[in-house]
Amino acid sequence: MERIIFHVDVNSAFLSWSAVKRLREDPSSVDLRTIPSAVGGDVETRHGIITAKSIPAKRFGITTGEPVVKALQKCPGLVLVSSDWETYRQSSQAFMAILCEYSGMVEQASVDEAYVDMTETVDARLLKNCSRLQGEPLRAAR
């Protein structure tokens, strides 16, 4: 049987997880995912590199790994937030736990991505759907 493997990746994981934490702590705050924003570097001194950016920041040409000072030249209104490694660790664990609900075969590739063997899950759902659409498989085969 051919295996069905999904590659699952969280888009802009550090920024997304920082945004969710910020909204939980202050529901009236602006969602970082909707404005030009980035995670990385030292927010106070504006040194270091961008480790994640929002889609609106990407539209300004900001790239992961570029110096914060260069990103700020491209987008002076860029909102910078500091890295929060504890939040990322907890979010990564929660992400992996969700994937494990769908398959017992999950291979974590990084903090925000994994390979998930969905072969049995997909086969079981297809059988269930076949039964629902066509009746019992043996009865339908007669």
Q: Each predicted region: which residue ranges?
A:
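Residues that scaffold, gate, or flank divalent-cation-dependent active/transport sites
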Residues: 1-139
